[in-house]
UniProtKB/Swiss-Prot annotation:
Keyword Membrane attributed: no
Domain Ubiquitin-like: 8-83
InterPro entries per record: STI1_HS-bd, UBA, UBA-like_sf, Ubiquilin, Ubiquitin-like_dom, Ubiquitin-like_domsf, XPC-bd_sf
Gene that specifies this protein: ubql-1
MF (Gene Ontology): damaged DNA binding; polyubiquitin modification-dependent protein binding
Entries under CDD domains matching the protein: UBA_PLICs, Ubl_Dsk2p_like
Induction comment: Induced upon ER stress.
Compositional bias annotation for Low complexity: 84-115, 274-290
Domain STI1: 124-157, 161-200, 289-327, 351-387
Protein's name in the database: Ubiquilin
Keywords from the named record: DNA damage, DNA repair, Repeat
């Protein structure tokens, strides 16, 4: 440079800190980022985002172009590290050829013309949860991976739970964790591998027990339980009267902390702050199974199914041709997959007719789910309400008179013992009953409508974040509120959402 440029001081403000940077007045934005990286060594240059008057500054632009002078303030946002997504190009050609290798519905005629007649007897999902192999099969299912790999879907599910909302308001760092797709992915990997999950829990218990031997450690654990763990348990079991994991505690007697000081623990850690459990030790396994059934019967899980069936974009992604073809190909390449699923259904194990009907219904169910007219009908609010009423009826029968539910299922399997007319309207009714059976098989919420939280004013909840967005130059308050609500108050994620939105 022929002439030496004057140095100016620029204030760089992040959501949690403020830095002063001395830089040449005509320096580029890229040079400013290099200066900022000194203060945030954990980030890379591609993640650094400089905002001034509501606009994101590009690397090749200069400070003088935006009239940034001495004493001016710019805002710093660290973008989330983008996780590379696997390219489905290799799977698509093979998936497209899968339908030709599968038997068509016409090759295996169904007496009732009902592709879902056997689905009503699938029983509780707790049977799958208690079986590691079945759980692994569910987690490897393309539909499950599609759902859990969608951050927007997971945010919507969490957002619908009032206990989670209250927890995130009290602990913003929890909201930041829930916005991290890597955390969700690692959690799903842990669930897919039960042995790894059990080992992780054992190490976790030992680490907490050892922490009790440190001065002040027990108080920190109590705060952790009261502020995080207890609200999390309540959010998952808000329909229950107690802690669903109470049966895992066993004997609550424990030696004083001073007697354990300096000693490494090799035993599992009981919960010292929850209510006392009066169950006998020999009933723990039965209680654990009942607890998981009650957990799956909570309104939060029920709202999950309702949101899945009321979100058009989610339905489009769940039942897209690529997903359907992938599932069909997996079923064709692995015949034992269906057998393993059927083997976990109690009613199917005892009834070969239901078992065979389930095996025959899978290909037809996939074909129906890929039919646009069926999906259009399922998006109709009146149809959804009708399915909800049918779901409640099946749930009531399952709880109050399971023998009648089995009788209905036997009638559907045997050619329509209840009002089977050999005409076109009867065939349509059978198809409708088939969809009802499908919803009943997906009934993870016990048929009860999900409880809704009292409306909360997001402008009051995120008042401080709204002020910071306003100071950054984002003047549209409605868009700011929507972005903060979608990201649970995470300012960095909200800014990134605003910048990426049209």
């Amino acid at each position: 440079m022929a002439t030496e440029s004057a140095l100016i001081k620029v204030h760089v403000k992040s959501p949690s800190n403020k830095y002063d940077v001395e830089i040449a007045a005509d320096a580029s934005v890229s040079e400013l980022k290099d200066k900022v990286l000194v203060f945030v060594p954990t980030a890379n240059k591609e993640q650094v985002c400089i905002i001034y008057t509501g606009k994101i500054l590009k690397d090749e632009e200069t400070l003088t172009q935006h009239k940034i002078a001495d004493g001016h303030t710019v805002h710093l946002v660290i973008r989330n590290q983008a996780r590379p997504t696997p390219a489905p190009a290799a799977a698509t050609p093979t998936a497209s050829s899968a339908p030709s290798s599968n038997p068509t519905p016409s090759s295996q005629p169904n007496p009732t013309n009902n592709p879902f007649a056997a689905m009503g007897g699938m029983g509780s999902p707790a049977d799958i949860l208690n079986n590691p192999d079945a759980m692994r099969s569910v987690m490897d299912n393309p539909i499950t991976q599609q759902l859990l790999g969608n951050p927007e879907f997971m945010r919507t599910i969490i957002q619908s739970n009032p206990q989670f909302q209250a927890l995130i308001e009290r602990n913003p760092e929890v909201g930041h964790i829930l916005n991290d797709p890597n955390v969700m992915r690692q959690t799903m990997e842990m669930i897919r591998n039960p042995n790894m999950f059990q080992e992780m829990m054992r190490n976790h218990d030992q680490a907490i027990r050892n922490l009790q031997g440190i001065p002040g450690g027990e108080a920190a654990l109590e705060r952790l339980y009261n502020d995080v763990q207890e609200p999390l348990l309540n959010s998952a079991t808000n329909s229950l009267s107690g802690n669903p994991f109470a049966s895992l505690r066993g004997d609550q007697s424990s030696e004083p902390r001073v007697d354990r000081a300096g000693q490494e623990n090799n035993e599992a850690l009981p919960n010292p702050w929850a209510s006392n459990a009066n169950q006998a030790t020999n009933n723990q396994s039965n209680n654990r199974s009942a607890d998981f059934n009650s957990l799956l019967d909570s309104p939060g899980i029920s709202s999950l199914m309702e949101q899945m069936m009321s979100n058009p974009s989610m339905q489009a992604s769940m039942f897209s041709p690529e997903v359907i073809n992938s599932i069909r190909q997996n079923m064709s390449n692995n015949p034992g997959l269906i057998d393993s699923i059927v083997g976990q259904i109690p009613s199917a194990r005892d009834n070969p007719q239901i078992s065979e009907g389930i095996r025959r219904s899978f290909p037809q169910m996939l074909n129906m789910m890929s039919d646009p007219s069926v999906m259009e009908a399922m998006r109709n609010p009146r149809v959804s309400e009708a399915f909800r009423q049918i779901q409640e009826g099946f749930s009531t029968l399952r709880r109050e008179a399971p023998q009648l539910l089995n009788l209905f299922q036997a009638g559907a399997m045997g050619g329509g013992a209840f009002g089977s007319d050999a005409n076109a309207s009867s065939a349509g009714a059978n198809s409708a009953n088939g969809l009802a059976d499908l919803f009943n098989s997906m009934n993870m919420g016990g048929g009860r409508p999900s409880s809704t939280a009292a409306p909360v004013n997001p402008e009051q909840t995120y008042a401080s974040q709204l002020e910071q967005l306003q100071s950054m130059g984002f003047s549209d308050r409605a868009r700011n509120v929507a972005a903060l609500t979608a990201t649970f108050g995470d300012l960095n994620a909200a800014v990134e959402r605003l910048l990426n939105s049209p």
